[in-house]
Regions:
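Midchain, well-structured core segments that form catalytic/ion-binding scaffolds
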Residues: 1-125, 137-146
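Feature targets compositionally biased, intrinsically disordered low-complexity regions
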Residues: 90, 128, 163-164
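Ser/Thr- (and often Asn-) enriched beta-sheet segments in non-cytosolic proteins
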Residues: 98-100, 131, 170
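A local structural motif
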Residues: 126-134
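Zn-dependent metallopeptidase/amidohydrolase metal-coordination segment
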Residues: 133-179
Length: 179
């Protein structure tokens, strides 16, 4: 949350501290930090502004930015989270605003590990002729299965019967029984 000082945008803008400008600088700094993320760490940072002010003729005194940070390892997303926080602190400092950062836990990264032979065999039997595809390594998304994988072995699977990308406009169920 970025906090500034409201003032009339036309009559006395110099008396305000624009929280939206501070947040915008934070977003720009975060964007410039992206080149510091190593490709092999699969870091993804997704910020959105959920509150950008109250009225168009008032210098915004509060802006709320929510951000999801993901990575292939705990170290990778911890590093990205620090850079994210630092970016928004810098934006606030530059504009004379204040920033309140609340860090909430997200999902732990998933672990792409070889399946235990007995689990793999059981999956092949239950698949009844449907080909079993080997794990292909880390995927860009995250899910609570990563949390469980850090505690115990987990055998994950996907089904067919769909085309297109998950959470994308082209996603479509093509075979309801298989899906």
């Amino acid at each position: 949350r970025v906090l500034g000082k409201a003032s009339h945008a036309a009559g006395a803008p110099e008396k305000g501290v624009n929280a939206l400008s501070a947040a915008s600088l934070g977003l720009q700094a975060l964007g410039l930090n992206r080149e510091t993320f190593r490709d092999e760490d699969c870091v993804r940072v997704h910020p959105i502004i959920t509150k950008g002010g109250n009225l168009v003729n008032v210098i915004p005194d509060e802006v709320v930015v929510e951000t999801l940070v993901r990575g292939k390892t705990i170290e990778a997303f911890t590093d990205a989270a620090k850079k994210t926080d630092r970016s928004f602190k810098a934006g606030a400092i530059a504009m004379g605003a204040k920033v309140e950062i609340s860090t909430l836990p997200g999902y732990l990264p998933t672990l792409a590990e070889e399946a235990l032979p007995e689990l793999k065999h059981a999956a092949e039997i239950s698949a009844s002729g449907i080909p079993v595809i080997e794990a292909s390594g880390h995927a860009g998304g995250s899910t609570d299965v990563g949390d469980v994988q850090h505690l115990m072995p987990v055998y994950t699977f996907n089904t067919g019967g769909v085309k297109g990308g998950l959470h994308q406009i082209d996603f479509e169920v093509t075979d309801e029984e298989e899906a």
